A protein has these predicted regions:
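Short, basic/aromatic recognition patches
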Residues: 99-107, 175-221, 266-267
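Sensor-regulatory modules in signal-transduction proteins
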Residues: 224-227
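Juxtadomain coupling helices with adjacent low-complexity linkers
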Residues: 192, 199, 204, 215-216, ...
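Amphipathic alpha-helical effector-binding/dimerization core
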Residues: 78-177
Length: 274
């Protein structure tokens, strides 16, 4: 008989004294979430793990409090910020990668800037794809970025566009655990001010990062939505500050990025509310 039944590992008596069943059950709940079932209710989790509903609810409530799970509509749960959201990120990356060659290439050509696409994974963004500009010189830092590269979400335009649509708890978690790289010198990265900025980004639907990660580079990003309206990724362009003034950014690049994000969201099945 397999030692794993209902997602729970059953050890022989000789090992039980060194084994924490509570920890194992908590981890089993996290493992119950997969790319095919990103949202689960208490009854579904209890059935998968063969646990009682009261016990499952107690563990789930603890995981929510610790930000390993988050509770959404209809009392469903999904992996939270601290869980790293591997299942959801994998699904999002796959769906977005199918769109990226055409859409990113088109955005790059229209903006004459390098265009990128990323998803949120824990407190970082993970690059899904990039379309590099043939006319724009790349800094050493920017040139190293490619598929799979990670950056602290709060330090990037795409990260801020994504965090703007997460819960306040998740926003603070990402900011607190995002490290203190080169952006520490920018006053706008103070936690309180950044949280306020995320609120403004949510309203205007695009984010601007002025030399936050790469010296001399301004990035403009907008969120991508799937069919349900959930923000699952972000797209951006990276422009040299010597070429693009802030006025030109707002009047030319921001509308291009937002339009590209809307086009990609439509391909993902999203229809804006009327």
């Amino acid at each position: 008989m397999s030692p794993i039944r209902g997602g729970i590992l059953h050890l022989p008596p000789s090992h039980e004294s060194r084994y924490s069943q509570s920890l194992e059950r908590g981890l089993a709940i996290l493992r119950a979430f997969t790319p095919d079932r990103p949202w689960l209710g208490i009854a579904e989790i209890a059935e998968v793990l063969e646990m009682s509903r009261p016990t499952t609810h107690r563990y789930a409530s603890t995981l929510v409090a610790l930000n390993y799970l988050e509770q959404g509509p209809a009392r469903k749960y999904r992996l939270g910020m601290r869980a790293g959201d591997p299942g959801r990120s994998a699904v999002n990356s796959t769906a977005l990668r199918k769109l990226s060659p055409h859409c990113l290439g088109d955005l790059r050509d229209r903006s004459a800037c390098t265009a990128s696409l990323a998803v949120l994974n824990g407190s970082d963004i993970v690059y899904v794809d990039r379309a590099r500009s043939l006319w724009q010189s790349q800094s050493e830092v920017s040139a190293r970025l490619g598929r799979g590269s990670r950056l602290p979400a709060g330090h990037t335009a795409m990260g801020r566009a994504l965090l703007a649509h997460r819960s306040p708890q998740e926003q603070r978690e990402a900011i607190d655990t995002g490290g203190d790289q080169c952006v520490a010198r920018a006053a706008s990265t103070a936690t309180g001010k950044l949280l306020e900025e995320l609120g403004r980004i949510r309203e205007k639907e695009f984010a601007i990062a002025d030399q936050l990660h790469v010296e001399g580079q301004i990035c403009v990003a907008a969120p991508l939505r799937e069919r349900s309206g959930e923000v699952i990724g972000a797209v951006d362009v990276a422009a040299p500050k010597t070429t693009f003034s802030r006025t030109r950014i707002l009047e030319r690049l921001a509308p291009l990025v937002v339009a590209s994000a809307e086009e990609m969201s439509a391909h993902l099945g999203y229809t804006p509310p009327r």
